Amino acid sequence: MASTLSTLSVSASLLPKQQPMVASSLPTNMGQALFGLKAGSRGRVTAMATYKVTLITKESGTVTFDCPDDVYVLDQAEEEGIDLPYSCRAGSCSSCAGKVVAGSVDQSDQSFLDDDQIEAGWVLTCAAYPSADVTIETHKEEELTA
């Protein structure tokens, strides 16, 4: 008994022409934009949280925006077109001082505020990551230093 092999061949001229997709042509933050994921070192992927930040400002009133947990509140506010005071951008002065009304932030990168001030709700927006949905009154430097 003889067996027969059959194959199907399709001429390339019958298939629609498409440009090949090259990985380098994709946006580098594709996974972050689509799935809230961020590439880590050695190919690891970490989930990234995003929180609602509400700023109560003198000029703009109340403004709310989404802020990833690895972006400083001041930096994201600037990306959103919100003008906030700042000077050092390193958490070592009080120009960007605000007061947390609700929620919480991680401001372990700052060196200006002492533990009592942090416990009282003071925040430096240039060195504060949101750690939950948070509401912050801005433009509070004079009140902090009084």
UniProtKB/Swiss-Prot annotation:
Keywords recorded for this protein, A-Z: 2Fe-2S, Chloroplast, Electron transport, Iron, Iron-sulfur, Metal-binding, Plastid, Transit peptide, Transport
Disulphide-bonded residues: none
Transit peptide stretch: 1-48
Gene: PETF
Gene Ontology CC, one term: chloroplast stroma
Organism for this UniProt entry: Silene latifolia subsp. alba
Protein location: Plastid, Chloroplast
Ligand binding ([2Fe-2S] cluster): 88, 93, 96, 126
PANTHER family reported for this sequence: FERREDOXIN, FERREDOXIN-2, CHLOROPLASTIC
Function: Ferredoxins are iron-sulfur proteins that transfer electrons in a wide variety of metabolic reactions.
GO MF annotation, one: metal ion binding
Pfam families hit by this protein: Fer2
UniProt name for this protein: Ferredoxin, chloroplastic
